[in-house]
């Protein structure tokens, strides 16, 4: 999401500023509203270019095909996702299976993993985020998030929640891991 919400709009704005006097009839409106929004806008014909931090899903590809729209995936950059916890949490590393179990609700208390005890508060991006889809695919093996996982609109919101909650865990793009009140957990 770091790329979709920040970098790509900045690059687009810089391109527009540099070419504002060029004689062409192309118009741009830049809006960073989530990967699903960009893909849907291309499929629905409301835009020619849609920004997305993930590839179109099978459902989106089928919808595009049924409407005669050919989607082209053109990568411009890559990001990574980090799992974060509050700085006071003694957990240093987790297996991918444990991360899956936390976010799907199979593990509900830190005591199941260590001497640190407290009800886990898990934070996720909302469903329109490409980061949400990537994390669900990579870490949850496409399983559903538990209903108690709180969905946030931005990486900044996840960091803010984990900063103030000693039992919090979340995932964010790498550009958001610099807060002294959180730490990145290594994944085995």
Enumerate the language-model features and the residues they cover.
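Exported/periplasmic ABC-transporter solute-binding proteins
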Residues: 1-188
């Amino acid at each position: 999401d770091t790329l979709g919400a920040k970098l790509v709009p900045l690059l687009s704005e810089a391109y527009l500023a540099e070419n504002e006097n060029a004689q062409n009839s192309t118009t741009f409106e830049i809006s960073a509203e989530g990967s699903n929004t960009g893909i849907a806008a291309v499929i629905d014909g409301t835009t020619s270019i849609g920004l997305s931090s993930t590839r179109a899903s099978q459902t989106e590809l089928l919808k595009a095909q049924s409407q005669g729209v050919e989607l082209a995936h053109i990568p411009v950059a890559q990001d990574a996702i980090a799992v974060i916890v509050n700085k006071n949490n003694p957990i240093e590393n987790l297996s991918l299976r444990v991360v899956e179990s936390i976010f799907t609700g199979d593990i509900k208390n830190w005591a199941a993993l260590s001497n640190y005890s407290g009800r886990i508060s898990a934070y996720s991006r909302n469903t329109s985020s490409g980061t949400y889809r990537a994390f669900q695919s990579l870490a949850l093996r496409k399983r559903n998030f538990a209903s108690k996982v709180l969905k946030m609109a931005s990486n900044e919101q996840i960091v803010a929640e984990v900063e103030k909650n000693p039992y919090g865990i979340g995932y964010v793009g790498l550009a958001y891991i610099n807060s002294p009140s959180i730490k990145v957990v290594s994944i085995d």
